A protein has these predicted regions:
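Catalytic-core regions of glycoside hydrolase
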Residues: 68, 112-115, 135, 166-169, ...
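C-terminal non-catalytic alpha-helical accessory regions
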Residues: 102-103, 377, 398-644, 651, ...
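Acidic, contiguous N-terminal accessory segments
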Residues: 1-41, 74, 705-713
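A short beta-strand element within beta-rich, extracytoplasmic domains
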Residues: 747-759
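Glycan-recognition and processing domains
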Residues: 678-735, 838-847
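Contiguous ligand/interfacial binding patches
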Residues: 764-829
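Extracellular and analogous surface-interaction loops
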Residues: 730-733, 737-750, 800-809
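Feature activates predominantly on carbohydrate-active enzymes
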Residues: 27-215, 234-235, 338-340, 361-362, ...
Length: 847
């Protein structure tokens, strides 16, 4: 090809194709980013409604050449995107905490993020966005300001050395300039309230503390940071997350309206700008509508964002309370962004179902009222830019290379989700055929494998999961205890009501069977049967395609292995669910034969899990890319442990051994070989601590008064708690200020805190990892004793344990009534204290 001036086109040979690019001068009634292509003879004219429209018109011609291998461009074609923003996100975060730092605290440095300074890699990513007609790039980080701007009032707040600071300036300028050339809007995300580490240390503060109040110092520092960022990087937008280190919704409103928006305005004023660039507000861990109602009178150009299926991909039929959040925000009339977030249930295997994605994007429009897309990587978000794959030569595979179909599907349907299904099958057959060097017909088997396997993880999580969040890594499996008593593990509220069709949990299904009650919606045994069928079909299709592959053979081998992984996982899960059904049958009918029948099912499940171990041991470094204490299901992921199937196999084998031993115990009891005796529960030993902030001690016993402002006394409490030194609190003060405990311990201790089981605003919220990433910093995420304290006129309470090493400590608890039950130097054995009444659950059979 060659470039010619428009004045010279008369001399073009009739056999040559001339492409003319122009931008519309009269844009009245034209859609943003749209284009028109018209061909007359050998002249094809691309007219963009704006600069982006010209770019996307050119992409249309490139796609035509790739699809049809000719230059016979359309006589007339007009197109424009359905979604206003269409973008991908990159996390400037890591799989583990940096030494001495908390969650999300990652300064921009070459040591932590060498890839961030790789310009060639950024060009490749930006070009990928353009290829898929995406127009936005989101950078996620806890507190980016201390890596990118300097404040005259707080010069010590910068978290990087001078050389790195200059590199960061240069990279940000480069990235925004290259993005701008491609019509891409760069948006920096940040959490609140996070402080720079040197700033926090200078003033004796924590970098983040969910339960501290907003102070003038913290507000001033953040306001000035935002202003300096806006002034220095005027073409970079801000995505504001009002969690996960803010206490109340009222604090969120105050922070956004009195710190963030004024900071943006200060930056604009310094530039002499009177326009309002968009500020994006996440509806995560906040009441977004409440914030928007307060903020819109102050700043008009506000966009909203909410997670599509939470932190997983579970359905293209969303409903319930989480869908209402979307529709309420959409009704405000601003741009509403659907966030395809984390994808915890898809890690780490390949996923790329065009049919699922097209239906999901339709749901974003029709159910949620969204008109923009924010897209996470398909897997390994925390390990960007690498995948979890182990390559034979020890090198790492890049996500952009492996997961090209992920970005292509979401980009294609964010542009237009109303495409004809039969034409789409032809399109994807051609795409896959070109990539793997097969005919379109042969590539149809690869598409079939993607679409069959694409149903497995979504269906299983929405019907059996504890949460859609980072807290659970589905594809490592689940314990029997989690299947027979999911409530013990704190099912995330709203998950089952929002992230799939109406249906039943296994525990509900069995109860209805025994009570002869009608079933409703999607049923657990149907789902496990379906995923087995999906797995069989995916493997049959991918194996059938194998002989035809002539290109990217190694990558095809990895895709083929993933399909086999999905199949073995589906088989293992199916058999485990059937075993759990038998155990639940025993709970209702007390027939020991039901427990006997569970054993071969568990053994067969393990056989398939061992095959899964064999398929993954040499092919994957890990399943989950978030490798911290936040990962709790199926088991804690503290310190990067329990992240492979090989590690999990040992736990699942122990689970079966425990079950067999406990079953034998039941049989011995039934045969009269064991005499029943109530296990003696001894009180916990009190730890010797020195209280530094004047709390009022009270001996913990029946009749004790734990609140100075309410008459109710302790009616009953778990035997473990008898005799501990608790502390009398004022509930009204707790509601207004939260609870502070300052103490000194000579040896490691556990502080026991009681949270009331009630969602009224007056009661402090128990730790919840879905909305507070620091909720397990002290090992407090799960209750140690459930139904353990009863006070007259108040709800039952669960007891959580906060572990501290020797030394001086200050703990802030959330606002609301909560009980400080004392310190112990003993380990607390988890159990249901049963003050709610006798409720036998079957999870004990597996311990």
């Amino acid at each position: 090809y060659s470039s010619v001036m428009l004045s010279d086109t008369a001399g073009i040979d009739k056999d040559e194709v001339c492409i003319r690019l122009e931008q519309a001068t009269d844009t009245a009634g034209l859609k943003k980013e749209g284009f028109t292509i018209s061909t007359r003879g050998n002249m094809t004219t691309v007219t963009g409604n704006d600069g982006n429209g010209v770019i996307y018109g050119c992409r249309e011609l490139i796609d035509h050449v790739g699809q049809y291998k000719d230059l016979k461009f359309p006589a007339q074609l007009t197109d424009a995107p359905e979604m206003v923003l269409r973008g991908g996100c990159v996390g400037i975060q890591k799989m583990e905490y940096l030494p001495g730092r908390g969650v999300y605290e990652y300064p921009y440095t070459p040591e932590s993020f060498p890839w961030f300074y790789d310009k060639e890699q950024w060009i490749k990513y930006l070009d990928m966005l353009v290829e898929n007609r995406m127009n936005s790039l989101y950078l996620w980080n806890g507190h980016p300001f201390a890596s990118l701007v300097k404040l005259e009032e707080y010069p010590f707040a910068v978290e990087v050395d001078e050389e790195t600071f200059k590199k960061n300036e240069e990279m940000f300028s480069f990235l925004t300039a290259e993005a701008d050339k491609r019509g891409i809007f760069v948006i920096q995300m940040f959490y609140n309230i996070l402080l720079s580490k040197p700033f926090a240390e200078h003033y004796g503060l924590k970098t983040q503390d969910r339960n501290r109040p907003i102070t003038p110092l913290i507000s001033d520092y953040t306001r000035k940071s935002v202003a300096a960022f806006i002034e220095k990087y005027p073409n970079v937008g801000l995505l504001v997350c009002l969690g996960e280190a803010m206490d109340t919704y009222e604090d969120d409103v105050e922070w956004f309206t009195k710190t963030i928006i004024p900071g943006v305005k200060d930056g604009l004023k310094a530039l002499g700008r009177t326009d309002e660039p968009p500020i994006l507000l996440r509806a995560h861990d906040t009441d977004c509508k409440m914030v928007m109602d307060a903020a819109l009178p102050l700043y008009k150009n506000l966009y909203t964002m909410h997670k599509y299926n939470g932190e997983s991909l579970t359905t293209y039929e969303p409903r319930g309370p989480w869908s209402k959040i979307h529709s309420d925000l959409s009704a405000l009339g601003s741009i509403h962004i659907s966030n395809v977030h984390i994808l915890a249930n898809l890690e780490p295997w390949r996923w790329g179902s065009p049919d699922f994605v097209q239906k999901a994007v339709n749901a974003m429009h029709n159910v949620h009222g969204a008109n923009a897309l924010h897209l996470y990587p398909q897997a390994s978000y925390w390990d960007w830019p690498y995948t979890a794959d182990k390559l034979p030569d020890g090198k790492r595979e890049y996500q952009l290379d492996r997961d090209w179909i992920w970005y292509k599907t979401w980009g294609r349907y964010a542009w237009n989700c109303h495409r004809d299904r039969s034409s789409e099958v032809e399109y994807w057959d051609k795409q896959l055929g070109d990539y793997y060097g097969t005919t379109s017909a042969e590539a149809g088997d690869i598409l079939e494998a993607y679409e069959q396997s694409g149903e497995i993880a979504p269906k299983l999580l929405r019907r059996f999961g504890i949460t859609e969040g980072n807290r659970q890594t589905l594809l490592l499996g689940m314990f029997m205890s989690q299947l027979v008593n999911p409530y013990k593990y704190t099912i995330y509220p709203g998950f089952y009501e929002s992230c799939g069709p109406e249906g039943e949990k296994l525990i509900e299904y069995v109860e209805k069977e025994w009570k002869k009650q009608p079933h409703v919606g999607e049923l657990p045994l149907d789902i496990v049967a379906q995923v087995v069928e999906h797995g069989d079909k995916a493997v049959a299709a991918i194996d059938k395609a194998a002989a035809a592959v002539t290109r990217n053979k190694e990558e095809f081998g990895r895709l083929q292995n993933d399909m086999h992984c999905y199949r073995e996982f589906a088989y293992a899960f199916n058999l485990k669910v059937k075993a759990a059904q038998r155990v639940l049958n025993y709970q209702w009918g007390k027939d020991l034969n039901e427990l006997d029948a569970a054993i071969p099912l568990m053994e067969q499940s393990l056989d398939h899990y061992r095959k899964l171990v064999a398929l993954t041991d040499s092919t994957y470094y890990y399943a989950n890319s978030m490798q911290t204490a936040q990962r709790r299901i199926p088991i804690g992921g503290d310190g990067g442990k329990n992240k492979t199937w090989k590690e999990m196999l040992v736990h699942y084998e122990n689970e079966l051994a425990n079950f067999k031993a406990n079953l034998q115990l039941l049989k011995d009891r039934a045969a009269g070989k064991v005499t029943e005796s109530a296990a003696e529960i001894k009180p916990l030993s009190a730890a010797n601590v020195k209280i530094l902030n004047g709390l009022t001690p009270v001996k913990l016993a029946t009749g004790a008064n734990l609140f100075s402002n309410v008459p109710g006394k302790v009616d009953a409490l778990a035997a473990e708690l008898e005799g501990l030194t608790a502390y009398r609190m004022n509930g009204d003060v707790q509601r207004k200020e939260g609870t502070t405990i300052e103490f000194e311990a000579a040896a490691p201790v556990n502080l026991l805190v009681g949270y009331f089981r009630d969602d009224q605003k007056k009661y402090a919220k128990a730790p919840k990892l879905e909305t507070d990433a620091s909720a397990n910093d002290y090992g407090q995420a799960e209750p140690k004793l459930t139904n353990a304290v009863r006070i007259a006129g108040m709800p039952l309470a669960n007891v959580h344990a906060y572990h501290f090493e020797a030394g001086k400590h200050t703990l802030l608890l959330p606002k609301g009534y909560t009980m400080v039950l004392g310190f112990t130097d003993a380990q607390v054995t988890p159990r249901n204290a049963g003050l709610a009444g006798a409720e036998e659950t079957m999870d004990w059979m597996f311990y």
